[in-house]
Amino acid sequence: MDSPALGAVALLLAGFWHLGLTATNYNCDGALVSTLPSSAFTSSSEFFSTHSPSFAKLNRRDGAGGWSPLDSNEQQWLQVDLGDRVEIVGVATQGRYGSSDWVTSYTLMFSDTGRNWKQYRKDDTVWVFTGNSNADSVVHHKLLHSMKARFLRFVPLKWNVGGHIGLRVEVFGCSYKSDIADFDGRSSLLYRFNQKLMSTFKDVVSLKFKSMQEDGVLFHGEGQRGDYITLELQKGKLSLHINLGDSNLHFTNSHTSVTLGSLLDDQHWHSVLIERFNKQVNFTVDKHTQHFRTKGDSDHLDIDYELSFGGIPVPGKPGTFQRKNFHGCIENLYYNGVNIIDLAKRRKPQIYTGNVTFSCSEPQIVPITFVSSSRSYLLLPGTPQIDGLSVSFQFRTWNKDGLLLSTELSENSGSLLVYLHGGRLTLLIQKVAEDPVEISEGTNLHDGLWHSLNINARRHRITLTLDNNAATASHATTVSRIYSGNSYYFGGCPDNFTDSQCLNPITAFQGCMRLIFIDNQPKDLILVQQGSLGNFSDLHIDLCDIKDRCLPNYCEHGGKCSQSWTTFYCDCNDTSYMGATCHNSIYEQSCEAYRHQGKTSDFFYIDSDGSGPLGPLRVFCNITEDKIWTAVQHNNTGLTRVQGAGPEKPYTMSFNYNSSAEQLEAVINSAEYCEQEAAYHCKKSRLLNTPNGIPFAWWVGRANEKHLYWGGSLPGIQQCACGLEESCLDMRYFCNCDADREEWTNDTGLLAFKDHLPVTQIVITDTNRSNSEAAWKIGPLHCYGDRQFWNAASFNTEASYLHFPTFHAEVSADISFFFKTTSLSGVFLENLGMKDFIRVEIRSPKEITFSIDVGNGPTEATVQSPTPLNDNQWHYVRAERNLKQTSLQVDNLPKKVLEAPAEGHFRLQLNSQLFVGGTASRQKGFLGCIRSLHLNGQKLDLEERAKMTPGVKPGCPGHCSSYGNLCHNGGKCVEKYNGYSCDCTSSAYEGPFCKEEVSALFEAGTSITYIFQEPYPVTKNASTSSSAIYADAITSKENIAFSFLTAHAPSLLLYINTYFHEYLAVILSKNGSLQVRYKLSKDGLLIFTIDSGNFANREMHHVKINREGRELIIQVDQVIKLKHNFSEIDFKAIKSLTLGKVTDSLPLDPEVSKANAYGFTGCMSSVWYNHVAPLKAALRHPSIAPVTVKGSLTESSCSSLMETDVNTATTIYSSSDPFGKTDEREPLTNAVRSDSAVIGGVIAVVIFIIFCIIAIMSRFLYQHKQAHRSSQTKEKEYPENLESSFKADIDLQNTVSECKREYFI
């Protein structure tokens, strides 16, 4: 068994030992109240003496049959003194016998002293117990976790509407025995070992403590080699410092420090358990556990001489301590099974004590809690007209702002205000006709810790002291003398209070106060509670009900938690997540999702598990027409040379993908297909074949498994691709490299078994022989397809559904999916618990509802749509619930957000199966399609489950009805089983969404001519019923669009001529204006000039010319520049279209001829004529399209040239495929630097020169042959996947040598 496993077993056994050690009595269910004397019962008030609390024993009929208070309100309570600290495991209640008085709900509070009460909580929420429904039945409650206390209070919350509060009670439990030590802040216990050194591999320390201050050392031990362990309170939190010293201490940092807990200075008991086995440590404070491993190499803890508890004594200096000592009580202190306090009580010689006693002495401090931000206040009387003022108190809060004190000073000396603003303390004295006096002190006083405040004034001088630090006290001087006030308002002012005795320039205080002194006299807050001193509103007296809402931290994915008194906030900056609790990823889950948003190829972050624990991963998304590829790069994708590696000294390379193994696994599992190229170039270096069967090279994949097959082969077969194809150089072997030849060869192929990918390491062992050399290359991880994005199911009956395991989402739940339907209503999904549930449904054609109940009653978030959602289109739904809010998003409609209550139940407890498309009752089922269903980032495979479920079919057709609008510029949406694609055949653009421009650089002599099908017969009286094959040539309309960029005028942009010597020309005249010129046989020359500026200005311009019948519209740069109606036009029988220079001898008017002389120099993009894209045809289909190119034509991006001089733009555009694969039989010269590489380079240059000479000769021969080509043509059969527009227009010659395309090198 490995070390981590041993550690886990050891810690588990330690936990069982600890449980056995601390258990006091397994039969802990005895009745504790029935034998108590009458004096053990007290209450807030009593209706009559016959209704006193002494009659509140269960099943008793004495007096009036139970306790009832004077007034029935939430300030009443019944208190029981159980005589000693006991363990309480249950309670029971009854109403007042024979009456209409009973309590329907209540809370419990407990205390050791009858002061400083604590409310019983469950899941950090004050637990509300269900009471009675009549006067005599008994309602029992067994506590989820027991309480150890002497005093117990029942606090009624609600009671019978037709009666009053009435109560009889019983408490169940048993005696509780413990060993307690009281530390006064100046003492400690020392536990000395029997030997000089205590060396341990396993330690278990357990204790309970109650602290009177926020700092102090609980225990400490250290050794001479640097080992130490320290547990101490720091600002109300518990810190464990541990160092397992080793010999390399000076070279490594083995110190480990972990902090846990909060508000531990509240004078209540807190439990601690520390379990260590070697480096593995479990640190538990109350219910919160943190698991961690210590740093360094050592496994054992060496402590010299002794352990100290309560402080760290300085050797040789009795009574002197290194850090602040602990002030409070420690109970049941065990160190590795030794009861330290018991040894001390029995005065064992190994225990040395300071001023330590063995009972817990606690000060009778009464805190109060200001509950409301608007109504809470405490009014206490002062001693008026005293010369001077003295007020002091302590406070703690999470709120940055709040009024602490307001009073009107006597003798017209003004008003005194003390308040928090932005976490800083401000004291303000203001008086009419005098400048206000202001003092500001402190920062971050809303940190939840106790802060003391002391205000002293004498005559004209006032002093403000914060946290008893006299050295930093602030002083101010007033014009008038200061006299003590009559009334002091703490925390706020009464409602509608306009008297100047209480002023509040800020919100009311929410927090706790204690130790209030006015005029140097302490104020008894119990008298306030009894109504005999001052006044108050919305206070909890005798308890500080502060709660750390950031413990545990419910901000996910590393979000930073901050809080106020009523809620918490999450800072999601630098987390890659968003939302109220940083739950939702800001990135998509796959490249497929980015494509769905209309994105094009680029680097993106993807978050494969969405809101799950895995972080985002940077990938390259290659979004093409047919597949969407995801590429994950690693640290070494180039060709790498290897020499000198043998079995004793192998060559090893590990790959870093800048991601975790879990992230890569999620990407691979989500994809339909994955691959990695593996190339091994070898010269006398074998790959797989060895005499004993152990290969010379191998690779390591997922799960750290060693694999013995190479690229192009299959798992379990120790072969290369050529072995499967039976094409190896030497047929005796299964790899080319295994032939062990002196010349370079290679074995290259794809590794495509997903369960083995990615490649994490490669090992090579055969390059240490004479003249032996190898070079390897492992390409990036490539995957395509998102198995979930189009994963869908069709629900055909209302009774059909899919069921999945229970959805576990106690504190955070997000549900997202797409749906389409024609039904009026139906439940998308439902999961039930005993009382809790979660449901998403379409209630009406325009209404989606998300319903949830976590125990506080149902909550519904509803989104109303202005248009019906049952339109058989895909719609997106995202429902989310966290501790702060419940929300529902439908498509891009406004999100519906409901804030969660600050208190109450918050854990969603579900236990039934998850029903998708229906309910457990088989009613209100959904009819339609659901796809891409995610729950908390996890993907549910609807298709696989639908294959085995009657009434449900896998998949759902009809994606183009929703996503067809993503195909732009004339592209057509094509349905696919798992999605859709855009067919850009009928578009001048290309790309996955037909949005990418097709553009090229023209020089003065560049000419592109597109030849249309010749009409038959060539006559203007040709029947309109001629074959459809002539439709393009005889049409009587123009739909022209193109973009251009140039710095030259005049220029000929576009020329269209007919078989009847008519033409249409688009030119730039000498002054840069745009002209559209029609030459018609009837009307002669018609000229339309757009003279709105110089269009030869090195900027991109977009031109659209539309003529339908007699109406002509010319639009430039999205603005209609001209409209014209022809009297008559008959522009048909199109012969050809030319971009740039017209090279044939054609009749041109002088202006067109002049422009043609200059041709066109610049960039032209996305040219469209009716349904023909001549520029795209020239660049993409030169061998099959009826297009001729003359001069230099270089594909380029016009937008990239806008800042460049088009006269000198000569950079050739290269559209490199990031997934391009090279099929080389030798290593790349830039990777393998050897003499053979240099020779190869020289040979390549010579070959290149020879090809250039051949190309030039071919050009002249081709031009000569073109001049004498036959005018007769023969129709050719085209491939089926060719664009349909080309099939009708292409006119090819009989042989390839007679193609109309002209090439230039």
Swiss-Prot record:
Tissues of expression: Expressed in brain.
Domain F5/8 type C stretches: 23-174
Chain ranges on the Cytoplasmic side, renumbered to this chain: 1258-1305
Record localization: Membrane
CDD domains: EGF_CA (cd00054), FA58C (cd00057), LamG (cd00110)
Membrane topology of this protein: Single-pass type I membrane protein
Record keywords, A-Z: Cell adhesion, Disulfide bond, EGF-like domain, Membrane, Repeat, Signal, Transmembrane, Transmembrane helix
Record PROSITE patterns: EGF_3 (PS50026), FA58C_1 (PS01285), FA58C_2 (PS01286), FA58C_3 (PS50022), FIBRINOGEN_C_2 (PS51406), LAM_G_DOMAIN (PS50025)
Pfam families: EGF, F5_F8_type_C, Laminin_G_2
Biological process annotations from GO: cell adhesion
Domain named Laminin G-like: residues: 180-360, 367-544, 791-956, 1017-1198
Principal location listed in the UniProt entry: membrane
Ranges per topology, Extracellular: 23-1236
Annotated Fibrinogen C-terminal domain residues: 584-790
Secretion signal, residue range per the UniProt entry: 1-22
Residue intervals passing through the bilayer: 1237-1257
GO CC annotation: membrane
Disulfide bonds: 329-360, 512-544, 550-561, 555-570, 572-582, 929-956, 960-973, 967-982, 984-994, 1163-1198
InterPro entries in the record: ConA-like_dom_sf, EGF-like_dom, FA58C, Fibrinogen-like_C, Fibrinogen_a/b/g_C_dom, Galactose-bd-like_sf, Laminin_G, Neurexin-related_CASP
Domain EGF-like: 546-583, 957-995
Family the entry assigns: Belongs to the neurexin family.
Role played: May play a role in the correct development and proper functioning of the peripheral and central nervous system and be involved in cell adhesion and intercellular communication.
Name the record gives this protein: Contactin-associated protein-like 5
Gene name of the record: CNTNAP5
